[in-house]
Design a protein with these regions (language model features):
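Short, glycine/charged-enriched secondary-structure capping and boundary segments
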Residues: 9-12, 41-44, 71-72, 94-97, ...
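Fold-independent oxyanion-binding glycine-rich loops
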Residues: 30-31, 59-60, 83, 153-154, ...
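Active-site core of metal-dependent hydrolases
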Residues: 1-67, 87
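Alpha-helix N-cap/helix-start motif
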Residues: 5-6, 65, 91-95, 159
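C-terminal cap of metal-dependent C-N hydrolases
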Residues: 139-184
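His/Asp/Glu-enriched, well-ordered alpha-helical/loop segment
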Residues: 15-26, 70-153
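Active-site-proximal flexible loops/turns
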Residues: 5-7, 37, 91, 154, ...
């Protein structure tokens, strides 16, 4: 965070702008300095992040600070949410369940409509959502990696809002979990 965090963020943006091969392949972990920036500075930084195609991978929430996900997404910055692991030493709350993180993000950021909740699914799925903003099917498609969760929900919004039970997990085409039995 703080001044050194801001300088680091701008340094990484500059490096991505200087080297186009880094664009779309560079992510800043945590990036908590963004959560403390004045709005004007945040707007400028978000525009630069989007221009350089530098994404953010952070947590929800971190102590008493909310990351400016909405502002970043509006400018086109790719935003991911993660856990360090199930026993997260930086934040002891939660189970490691990414649907729980997506639910928490929706609650904290005021995403309440079916559409807004459906967009929050991307925080649990490494950016994948089944429908784009216009309702067109975008995932899964033939040729996509076979990494899937099967949840007890009628739609994406319900999966996020109810933290639906995971009934099955397929990773790289292999069944890892089906109902309550582990296949690994």
């Amino acid at each position: 965070g703080g001044e050194s965090g801001v300088k680091t963020i701008h340094y990484l943006i500059d490096k991505a702008l200087e080297n186009p091969a880094l664009q779309g392949r560079t992510f800043i972990s945590h990036a908590f300095a963004l959560g403390y920036m004045p709005k004007k500075d945040l707007a400028h930084t978000a525009e630069r992040l989007a221009e350089a195609k530098v994404g953010i991978c952070s947590s929800v929430p971190f102590r008493n600070m909310l990351m400016p996900f909405r502002e970043l997404k509006k400018t086109g910055v790719e935003v991911f949410v993660g856990n360090d692991n199930v026993q997260d030493h930086w934040g002891t709350f939660g189970s490691g369940n990414m649907l729980q993180k997506a639910n928490l993000a929706a609650e904290l950021y005021g995403y309440e409509t079916e559409f807004e909740l459906s967009r929050c699914l991307r925080y649990a799925t490494n950016g994948k959502i089944p429908l784009d903003d216009q309702g067109n099917s975008v995932w899964p498609k033939v040729g996509d990696d076979a990494n899937l969760l099967f949840v007890d929900a009628s739609c994406s919004a319900e999966a996020v809002s109810r933290i639906s039970t995971v009934n099955g997990l397929i990773h790289q085409g292999n069944v890892v979990k089906w109902n309550n039995s582990s296949q690994a």
